[in-house]
Amino acid sequence: MKKIVIIFPGAGYGLDSPLLYYADFIYETKGFDRIHMNYQSILSNTELSIENKLTKVREYVFEQVKDVNFAVYDEIVFLSKSIGSVEAGILAERLGIKAIR
């Protein structure tokens, strides 16, 4: 049984913060393939407007998963915090995947 988790951090809540760090550890021990989104440098770029930041984050997120064959996975989990929840929802809709937990 193939399983994957994609982790979407918040703007001020990174992958090394307790909620995401320990959840990632649990998914790792359960044999999940894991993808970590790391778009904090985009969000912290003071030269970009919020609209440009969000556009660049969406481009980054899609680039990270464009070659993933989600059809081979029996279980797909999106783990997210704050702005990451928005991006996870947008990605799920864009990919047309209904069976995401």
Region spans (language model):
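A domain-start/cap signature at the N-terminus of enzymes
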Residues: M1-K2, I83
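Primarily recognizes the serine-hydrolase "nucleophile elbow" in alpha/beta-hydrolase
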Residues: F62-R101
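Serine-hydrolase catalytic machinery in alpha/beta-hydrolase-like enzymes
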Residues: K2-D74
